[in-house]
Amino acid sequence: MEEHPPFRRLILEDDRIVENENFDLGIAVALEGDRLATAVIVEANTKNWPEFVKTYNETVDATRGGRVDAMNAPVVITSLGAFGVKAGAPIVVPPSVGTLFVGTAHRELIPNGKKNESAEVITLSLTFDHRVVNGAGAASFANKIKKQIEGFRIPAAKTDAIRT
């Protein structure tokens, strides 16, 4: 989002568009009774990995416990992966300008020269508000996310520190 300014913007109730240097990240959280709330990680871009994970866990737990945050997240991440859903078409709820759906991890055959190889994959679906971002900008943003996920590694020491 730091490299893609349109995804740091918010659409205010009066339809003004504002851009923030630091940005919040929304996480859709399923609640009892088929309800949904958004956990908000405030200034997500300023946190290192251990801080982000700690804040994520605390924020999601608080949201499940009934806390409602002011929703100022330009992008909300949602997933039905826990239910085995591979793909979805989320909607964008203002003030957000984008919603990223992350599907469940599953195996697919990937062509590799003369043979196919099995690989674990996920499906990403990005829905965005055309008043703020165009298709080419959204494609560039989605491609950046894809590349970051493909290259993502958590050092064992950091993972162990987060668990304790």
Where are these regions (language model features)?
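C-terminal catalytic/motor cores of large multi-domain enzyme assemblies
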Residues: 2-164
